[in-house]
């Protein structure tokens, strides 16, 4: 069904136009990514039989965080992992792809999905000594870090919990305790933001989202 051509007719489809005069079309003709015509196929173009599939206009998301979503896509996805071993394997694989000293970011771990349902201990990520690791819990209220990250922060070996925060097992930083860890993360560059926007845009288009209104964006 897919084509590498820039010009084609989509035929035999349930094509919803959102046009009151012709709400449903059978054929839509596309040229260089733009709709050329409805129900008037161009005989010089390749025709693709949709087999009755439905075609919708591109969706517009009115509240999107484009660069942040792209940034999240580059993080290790921990949402579906059900054990510490699975997380360690993901982290180990990511580290092997990057240079020493590169920050490792992950998102989505949830100890309530694990067998013991307890917060991890510091020895687990401290095994990785060459890369600062910062893994954000599913609710965004806790960070799981290693000693390589902690040593870059203002925390000393005593790891005293600040007001409004807590530190558990010398590696879990909760609420206000996260601030000093987040402060060590290198400021992103224009190149980073550009890459995140492109990554997020490609994923959004796969979902049929062709326009977004970014709800919040840092100045470039």
Across the structure, where does each feature detected by a protein language model lie?
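Divalent metal-binding segments
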Residues: 6-11, 16, 20-31, 35-37, ...
């Amino acid at each position: 069904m897919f084509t590498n051509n820039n010009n084609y007719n989509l035929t035999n489809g349930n094509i919803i136009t959102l046009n009151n005069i012709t709400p449903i079309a059978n054929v839509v003709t596309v040229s260089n990514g733009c709709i050329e015509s409805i129900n008037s196929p161009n005989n010089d173009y390749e025709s693709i039989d949709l087999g009755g599939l439905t075609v919708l206009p591109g969706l517009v998301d009115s509240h999107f965080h484009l660069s942040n979503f792209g940034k999240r896509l580059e993080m290790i996805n921990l949402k579906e992992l059900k054990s510490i071993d699975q997380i360690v394997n993901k982290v180990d694989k990511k580290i092997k792809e990057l240079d020493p000293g590169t920050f490792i970011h992950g998102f989505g771990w949830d100890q309530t999905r694990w067998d013991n349902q307890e917060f991890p201990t510091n020895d687990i990520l401290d095994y990785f000594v060459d890369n600062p690791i910062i893994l954000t819990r599913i609710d965004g209220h806790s960070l799981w870090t290693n000693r390589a990250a902690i040593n870059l922060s203002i925390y000393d070996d005593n790891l005293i919990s600040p007001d409004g925060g807590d530190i558990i097992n010398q590696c879990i930083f909760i609420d206000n305790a996260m601030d000093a860890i987040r402060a060590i993360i290198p400021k992103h560059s224009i190149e980073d933001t550009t890459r995140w926007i492109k990554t997020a845009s490609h994923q959004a288009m796969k979902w049929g989202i062709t326009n977004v209104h970014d709800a919040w964006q840092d100045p470039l």
